[in-house]
């Protein structure tokens, strides 16, 4: 008698969704952490000045901006790292705690959307599409392997 459970393809490989999200977050975090703004148009839309104009007009405020910008990148680096490690090991193996903890991911991106709703509409149109994609992907990554984490009771 063979008691081996055969996983469906989408259950077995859903962890790759979170691995991909983690890699994207990590890739964006590195220049962010080093102080390289990869979207200067967003800064200009929100602040009304280019980064260079901000640096010239208010060096102290620019230092504050740069500190928070770089430390946000450091936070993203940690977020991406843990996302990658958990998806590669615990989530891939079907450990329930990882499924529960990964509900933070769509909640995080949804909270980012809510926070972004206070920005000018031009900024929202830049931020919303990738956030919506990340929310949908993370929900798919949670719901596709549901039976892997919570098998039917016979």
Model regions: which residues?
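Short, Lys/Arg-rich, polar N-terminal cytosolic tail immediately upstream
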Residues: 1-8
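Interfacial segments of alpha-helical transmembrane regions
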Residues: 9-23, 98-102
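Helical transmembrane-bundle signal
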Residues: 18-32, 76-79, 83-86, 106-116, ...
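Hydrophobic transmembrane helix segments
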Residues: 21-69, 75
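Juxtamembrane helix-loop boundaries in multi-pass membrane proteins
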Residues: 65-69, 96-105, 130
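Juxtamembrane helix-break-helix junctions at the cytosolic face
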Residues: 80-100
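Membrane-helix boundary connector in multi-pass membrane proteins
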Residues: 111-131
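Membrane-water interface at the C-terminal end of transmembrane alpha helices
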Residues: 136-154
């Amino acid at each position: 008698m063979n008691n081996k459970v055969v996983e469906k393809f989408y259950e077995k490989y859903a962890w790759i969704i979170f691995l991909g999200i983690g890699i994207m977050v990590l890739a964006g975090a590195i220049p962010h952490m080093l102080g390289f703004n990869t979207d200067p148009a967003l800064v200009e839309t929100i602040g009304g000045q280019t980064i260079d104009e901000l640096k010239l007009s208010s060096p102290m405020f620019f230092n504050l901006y740069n500190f928070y910008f770089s430390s946000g990148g450091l936070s993203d680096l940690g977020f991406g790292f843990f996302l990658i490690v958990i998806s590669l090991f615990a989530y891939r193996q079907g450990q329930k705690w990882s499924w529960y903890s990964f509900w933070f991911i769509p909640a995080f991106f949804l909270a980012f959307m809510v926070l972004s709703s206070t920005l000018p509409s031009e900024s929202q149109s830049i931020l919303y599409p990738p956030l919506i994609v990340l929310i949908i992907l993370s929900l798919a990554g949670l719901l596709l392997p549901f039976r892997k984490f919570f098998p039917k009771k016979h």
